[in-house]
Amino acid sequence: MSLSPAIPLRVRDADIASTIGAELVSAEGVGLTLGGRQILVNVDVAVHAGEIVTLIGPNGAGKTSLARLLLGLVKPTAGKVTRASDLRVGYVPQRFPVDATIPIDVRRFLTLGVRVSLPAIRSVLQEVSALHLMDRPIAVLSGGEFQRVCLARALVGMPKLLVLDEPAQALDYAGEMQLYELIGDIRKRRGCGILLISHDLHVVLGASDRVLCINGHVCCEGIPEKVASHPEYARLFGREAGKAVAVYRHRHDHEHDLSGAVKCGDDCGHSHD
């Protein structure tokens, strides 16, 4: 992996900067070496309450490793990580293996390892539009349904920071749009910070306040439109990739149903082609 110097891009949207809250977690100059291989070099990142930060980059770029450093699951070999003293974290990993032979329903899944009241279970399932799944076996859920249930589990502990590793990997395009709208709604309701990890460029950039492009180091960072036009981004993903940011950047005055179809009438003011 080539570790060329990062090209700084620290542009902050004024509206975003005015609404974010206290710093929840930060990394300063962190590096990580595993088995003699450099995974991360001199990375700076911070996540504040009320903002959505996305780590993007190719497979093997160190995105998940950086998230694990921020969560304290591994220790950096250089630099330091600082977490708020009262930080509560909700984490949805990239893979959450569940043995299909074990008869466990959604209600039981949400209580594994934690004590949760039935009203709390109902509340988080309602929040992610999955209350109707409460008594359904985990083994029969679709990919999108299971992602919502995993998100509900992460919300049970009232986290101040929500970390989602490739949350849309099992979803089609319509499902991705629904999920990222839901994530945005959670941020607005709860005021929590959200760290997203993805290598998918089509929707996740438009759902983010700030983006860091990672390839062992921070190639570039800033608001989505600035990152998408950055030469380091184009070098990693191709010059056509920047057009993906515009796909879902506008604010909707319509809703989608569970199939992804638009629920508003013809006068909603948007093109849905």
Which residues does each PLM region occupy?
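Conserved ABC ATPase "signature" region
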Residues: L118-M134
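Conserved ABC ATPase signature
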Residues: P137-L141, E145
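Conserved catalytic motifs of ABC-family nucleotide-binding domains
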Residues: M158
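Catalytic Walker B motif of ABC-type/P-loop ATPase nucleotide-binding domains
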Residues: L162-E166
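H-loop/switch region of ABC-family ATPase nucleotide-binding domains
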Residues: S198-H199
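H-loop (His-switch) and adjacent beta-strand-loop-beta switch element
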Residues: V211-I223
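ABC ATPase nucleotide-binding domains
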Residues: S229, L236-D273
